From Swiss-Prot:
It is found in: Golgi apparatus membrane. This is Cholinephosphotransferase 1. It catalyses: CDP-choline + a 1,2-diacyl-sn-glycerol = a 1,2-diacyl-sn-glycero-3-phosphocholine + CMP + H(+); 1-octadecanoyl-2-(5Z,8Z,11Z,14Z-eicosatetraenoyl)-sn-glycerol + CDP-choline = 1-octadecanoyl-2-(5Z,8Z,11Z,14Z-eicosatetraenoyl)-sn-glycero-3-phosphocholine + CMP + H(+); 1-hexadecanoyl-2-(9Z-octadecenoyl)-sn-glycerol + CDP-choline = 1-hexadecanoyl-2-(9Z-octadecenoyl)-sn-glycero-3-phosphocholine + CMP + H(+); 1-hexadecanoyl-2-(4Z,7Z,10Z,13Z,16Z,19Z-docosahexaenoyl)-sn-glycerol + CDP-choline = 1-hexadecanoyl-2-(4Z,7Z,10Z,13Z,16Z,19Z-docosahexaenoyl)-sn-glycero-3-phosphocholine + CMP + H(+). Its main location: Golgi. It comes from the Eukaryota. Catalyzes the final step of de novo phosphatidylcholine (PC) synthesis, i.e. the transfer of choline phosphate from CDP-choline to the free hydroxyl of a diacylglycerol (DAG), producing a PC. It thereby plays a central role in the formation and maintenance of vesicular membranes. InterPro entries: CDP-OH_P_trans, CDP-OH_PTrfase_TM_dom, CDP_ALCOHOL_P_TRANSF_CS, CHOPT. Keywords: Golgi apparatus, Lipid biosynthesis, Lipid metabolism, Magnesium, Manganese, Membrane, Metal-binding, Phospholipid biosynthesis, Phospholipid metabolism, Transferase, Transmembrane, Transmembrane helix. Pfam families: CDP-OH_P_transf (PF01066). CDP-choline binds at N53, R108.
Amino acid sequence: MPQCECPEPLSAVQLKRLEEHKYSAAGRSLFEPPCQIYWNWLVQQIPTWVAPNTLTTIGLVINVITTVILVYYSPTATEEVPGWAFFLSALGLFIYQSLDAIDGKQARRTNSSSALGELFDHGCDAVSTVFVAVGTCICCGIGAYPNWMFFCGFVGMFMFFCAHWQTYVSGTLRFGLVDVTEVQIAIIIMYLLTAFTGVSFWEMRVPVLGVNLQTFPILGIIGGFLYSTYNYFFVIMNGGVGKNGSTVADTSVLTPGLHIGLILTLAFIIFKKSSSHLFEHHPCLYVLTFGMVIAKISNKLVVAHMTKSELHLQDTAFIGPGLLFLNQYFNSYIDEHIVLWIAMVLSLVDLVRYCTAVCLQIASHLRIRVFSISPQGHAHKD
């Protein structure tokens, strides 16, 4: 019987360019030098038979599980959460940050660096960004303010996408003085503080200023957004390394903006036009649903950079948000909460399917294993 096989996500030309890819990074964040002492010690404690991708995956799974516990107790990002859950989230994020920082060191230590390792690392970061954003909103009880919940929920994903957008344009991943490490440490401190004081702590008013304590993390997020976005778009708008100032794939530097712009526009329209106040009643599920979509297109952007290929707008990732939009167009014929769950499942399955297919195809092409160290492999700087 003839078998129907799904087309592989990468073409032969893309795989060839992937072999030629060289990792390029610039800049050093504020806390990186002291953290390097800890990371260098930690990687020496890891057995040499443990694959770098295994470390990253373990960290991501722990980070996701601890955040899901927060969502279980606080689905609207307004409820009180047991202190132990925030302790677990702080520990989960610390473990993820630690393992994510040493996966490249483990790859070099075991002579197993590869383009797959770089892609895998960025892919896990894309997913982690979604869950950390939700956890932070729950920590501060920002769900009480839907507009701020929307902003704080999606701004981190937008900045992550922009970081790789400027990489797609310039060919180099740039780190700022205040970057991911600093943000993660700040969130860990917030988790621990909330574990001792409760979510209601952030609702306390500062006597002199007359504002809630929630204002300060929001201001920090706004400041980080303005600082990072300015740096990213300074690189993007000054032209890329391709022909006539184009991207590494010789395409327009503005093309990736269509992807993130479309998904955020859909998310905002559905939020504001919902007759059942979908976002207000289910903010965490809403952010997670659209977060899976953004994680998918962020992964595609990383692949496009590493394979020097065009980023196409047509994508199955938009099916879930499209269903929500169409349902609203037909006056919410189906309960929006049900459609949101359907969109969540579709978006999650689509993300997992794409990432799995890409990893398996690259591993097969490079003759390496995803979660174990191959005797022989193609060495790329990780």
